[in-house]
Amino acid sequence: MAEGEDAGWWRSWLQQSYQAVKEKSTEALEFMKRDLAEFTQVVQHDTACTIAATASVVKDRLARTEASGATEKVRKGISDFLGVISDTFAPSPDKTIDCDVITLMATPTGTTEPYDSAKARLYSLQSDPATYCNEPDGPAELLEAWLSRFSLEEKKGEIAELLATSPSIRALYTKMVPAAVSHSEFWQRYFYKVHRLEQDEVRREALKQRAEQSIHQEEPGWEEDEEEFLGMSPLPCANVKFPQAAEKASVSAALEGSQPSVHKGPSGESWAILPPELAPAEGSPSESSESVSLVTQIANPASVPVVQLQTGVQPSGNRDLSQRLLEATSEEQSPLPKPPEPGHPSAAAQEPAVCSEQTAVTGPKEVESKAQGRTETLKEEGPTDLRVFELNSDSGKSTPSNNGKKGSSTDISEDWEKDFDLDMTEEEVQLALSKVEVSGELEDEEWEDWE
C-alpha cells in the first residue's frame, strides 16, 4: 500500500513538473516569435526606406551629370531603373516616418529642394496607387457635393502639366487607364484627395495659430504689472493717527491739569497746543473704584490753526487749581476715612495723593480766598474763550495712604453712604478759571458760597 501511494505521488509530481515546463517553454517561444517578427518588420521598413533614398540620390546625381552618346543612354537606363526601384520600395504614407521631418526631397524634374510638410504629403499622394484605385474616404455626401462643383474641362491644363512634370503620375496613369479605372475617375479621385489634403492643411494651420495665440496670452505681462505698481499712490503716512497714544497723552495731560499754551513757530505765527477730549484712562482699578470726572477744557476751534498733543510740563497755576479742587472735593466726601487694604494701591489713588501733598502746604483757607477773588473779577470782565467746564465727582473716596501722609486719597472705601454732586453753570466755571489766572487769591466766604 505504501509503495503504491509513493509511486502515485511521484507520478503526479512528474506530470505537474512536465506541465509547468511545457507552459513556460510555450510562453518563451511565443515571446521569441513576437520579438523576431517585430525585428523583421523594422529591418524591412528601414531597408526599404534606405533603398528608396539611395535610389533617389543616385538618380539625382546622374541627372545632373552632363553626358553624350552611348554613355548618356546607359546612364539614362540606369536612372530609369533606379526610379522604378524607388517607386516600388517607397513605403506608403501611413507606414513612413512623419512627413514633417522630411526637409529635402527629389522633385519629379530630378532636382532636390527644401519642401514643407504640405508638399511632402502631396508628393506621397501622387506616388501612391491607392489614390487612384480606391474610393475616397469620408461621407459620400461630401464627394457628391464636390463633384457637382468640379469640372474636368477646367483642369485640362493642370492635367497636362502633371503628366509632363511628374513621372510617378505618368507611370500610374499609363498602367491604370483604361485597364483599371476610367480617365474621369482617375482624375476625379486625384483632385478630390488633393482638395481634402488642402482642407487638412488649412485646419492644421488654424490650430497652430490658435495654439501660438493661447501661449502668447498666457505669458505674464510684467510691464503692465510694473506700470500699475508705479501708478499706485503711497499711503498717507503723515496722516496716520494712533488712537491709543492720543488717549494716553490726553489722560496724562488732564491729570496734570494741562492748559492750552501758546507757542510761536519759525514764521512768527502763534498757535495753541491743546489737549484732546479726555478719554477714559486705562488702568487697573481697585475693587471699589468708581469713575472720577476730571476737568476738561476745550478752546475755540476757529481761533486755533493747529491742534497737537503735549505731555510736557504745564503751568503751575493751572495744575494747582485742579489739585485744589480735587482735594476740596475729597475732604468733603470722606469724613470717616478707612484704612486701605495692604498691597492693592490703585492708579487713581496714587495720582490724587500727589495733589494732596501740594495742597497741604497752601491750606484750605488760601484756596477758598483765591476762588472767591477769581469769581468776583471774572463777573466784571466777562467770559473768555473757554467754553466747557465740568466737574462731576460722584465717587471720591479718600482715605489715608500707606505712608500716612495727610490728604492722600484712595478709592477702596466700602462704607460711603453719600454722593456729592457739584453743579455749576458754564458762566460760573469760566469766571472761576479766569480769576485764578488773573488774581490767584480766593476768600473763605466766596469759596463756601461757590460750593
UniProtKB/Swiss-Prot annotation:
* Pfam families reported in the protein's UniProt record: BSD (PF03909)
Question: What PROSITE patterns has UniProt attached to this entry?
Answer: BSD
Question: This protein is called what?
Answer: BSD domain-containing protein 1
- Domain BSD positions: 146-198
**Do you know which Gene3D superfamilies this protein is assigned to?**
BSD domain
Which region ranges are annotated with the description Disordered?
A: 252-296, 309-424
Q: Where is the composition biased (Polar residues)?
A: 309-320, 392-411
The source organism is Gallus gallus
Compositionally biased spans, kind Low complexity = 275-295
Spans of biased composition, class Basic and acidic residues?
Answer: 365-388
Locate the compositionally biased regions of type Acidic residues.
Answer: 412-424
Per the record, its GO cellular-component terms are: cytoplasm
Entry superkingdom: Eukaryota
